[in-house]
């Protein structure tokens, strides 16, 4: 491993062994063979971690490793799940063959998220080989059913609560080093998620109306009233929109790298916030989602008596705003004879990480050092991660995978032809090594 090319291939061949494990997770049942195969591969690839770490298996295949530190009262947590989604469609290379071609390793899980997991294990293994003493306890957690929000992370959370374990910081998947998220930036961006949108599933019910057919609105069927309600919500977009601290932080971090006139706008948020709130939803759906609650309607059906049922899947950023958004939604629904039913267990909200927290600042500084060619910025993640289960265990829950990917690789997550450039593997390992080596 004397040249970068040799190191690229070395890591690529080792990661390929993990990709060849078909660890597809299903709600319907657990098929252990490929998961046990991956466990054996990890044991072979990382013998020092296997020897020196305390390993606990949670549930059917979530695993938790602990390497003790010089200060036994402090802890940090690395995370990446090892389950993957099915690999349907037409692929250039078989999705579980682990083929290296054209400088890329092809296969399901190369981006989401066996590469980050491999980089975490590799960093631990290499630091142990160097004789490095970790300053604090280092935990590595990997769940087996993240892809369908299974119980792996919940079991880990219960374990940490039971053993009174809190963390200085937690690092999971989320952002990455990607192409600029908006026009006018001429360099790659290391996007670090410090918050992810909460999720709420509300039941919508439009029952048959009683009364004379000549009364106002009585001629509308439950389906018609449900459709009218959905249409009004979609057209009026009634939810609160604001520049949340995480979004302001993103704009402030990216503004120096923008071209004129975008730099002027994003460097003066006090003057232009109103304009941005109006324009962002027009840029793209993801930009609009960063401003507040998002709503998707689904699963519309009818009962034998004509009652129409549906669901509203709501994704919120701020819990106080969301409470007001729900009131607005209920009032709109009442006007159409639609009732909203919401149970406490159907509503999840996750505490954001402050941009001033020591943990975020440390991860940001590490990313700036390891990826000097990239602009480093926070953002709000619209998708879900295992990390959301742990926001009560740390003041700094960071969602960032140190993988440098292009647009095709980014789009391949849960799609066809997922792949990773093997020349980007060393820097991912180096990120975790620096994150652990310099922390005190």
Report residues per predicted region.
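An extended, acidic, His-containing surface patch that forms the Zn2+-binding/catalytic region
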Residues: 54-56, 71-73, 178-180, 187, ...
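A common structural junction motif
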Residues: 82-83, 233-238, 330-338
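Acidic/His- and Gly-rich active-site-bordering loop/insert found
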Residues: 2-110, 127-134
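A short core secondary-structure module
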Residues: 154-155, 159, 213-238
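Short, solvent-exposed loop/turn segments at the edges of secondary structure
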Residues: 73, 93, 135, 166, ...
């Amino acid at each position: 491993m004397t040249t970068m090319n040799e190191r690229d291939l070395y890591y690529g061949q080792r990661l390929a062994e993990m990709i060849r494990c078909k660890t597809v997770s299903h709600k319907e049942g657990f098929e252990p063979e490929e998961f046990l195969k991956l466990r054996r591969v990890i044991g072979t690839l990382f013998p020092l971690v296997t020897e020196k770490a305390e390993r606990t298996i949670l549930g059917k295949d979530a695993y938790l490793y602990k390497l003790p530190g010089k200060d036994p009262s402090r802890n940090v947590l690395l995370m990446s799940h090892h389950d993957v989604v099915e690999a349907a469609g037409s692929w250039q290379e078989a999705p579980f063959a682990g083929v290296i071609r054209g400088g890329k390793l092809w296969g399901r899980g190369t981006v989401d998220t066996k590469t980050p997991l491999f980089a975490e294990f590799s960093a631990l293994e290499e630091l142990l080989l160097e004789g490095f003493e970790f300053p604090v306890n280092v935990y590595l957690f990997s769940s087996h059913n993240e892809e369908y929000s299974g119980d792996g992370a919940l079991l880990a959370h219960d374990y940490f609560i039971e053993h009174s374990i809190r963390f200085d910081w937690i690092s999971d998947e989320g952002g990455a080093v990607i192409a600029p998220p908006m026009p006018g930036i001429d360099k790659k961006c290391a996007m670090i998620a410090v918050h992810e949108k909460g999720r709420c599933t509300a039941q919508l019910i439009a029952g048959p109306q009683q009364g004379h057919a000549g009364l106002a609105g009585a001629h509308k069927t439950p389906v018609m009233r449900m459709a009218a309600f959905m249409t009004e919500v979609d057209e009026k977009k009634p939810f609160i929109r604001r520049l949340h601290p995480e979004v302001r932080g993103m704009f402030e971090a990216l503004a120096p790298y923008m071209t004129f006139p975008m730099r002027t706008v994003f460097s003066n948020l006090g003057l232009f916030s109103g304009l941005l709130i109006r324009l962002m939803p027009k840029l793209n759906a993801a930009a609009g989602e960063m401003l507040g609650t998002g709503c998707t309607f689904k699963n519309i059906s009818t009962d034998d008596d004509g009652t129409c049922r549906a669901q509203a899947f709501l994704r919120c950023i701020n819990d106080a705003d969301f409470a007001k958004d729900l009131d607005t939604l209920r009032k709109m629904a009442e006007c159409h004879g639609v009732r909203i039913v919401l149970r406490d267990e159907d509503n999840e909200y996750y505490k954001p990480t402050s941009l001033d927290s020591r943990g975020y600042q440390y991860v940001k500084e590490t990313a700036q050092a390891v990826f000097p060619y990239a602009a480093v910025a926070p953002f709000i993640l619209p998708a879900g991660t295992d990390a959301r289960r742990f926001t009560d265990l740390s003041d700094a829950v960071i969602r960032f995978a140190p993988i440098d990917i292009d647009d095709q690789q980014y789009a391949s997550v849960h799609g066809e032809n997922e792949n990773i450039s093997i020349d980007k593997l060393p820097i991912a390992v180096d990120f975790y090594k620096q994150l652990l080596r310099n922390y005190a």
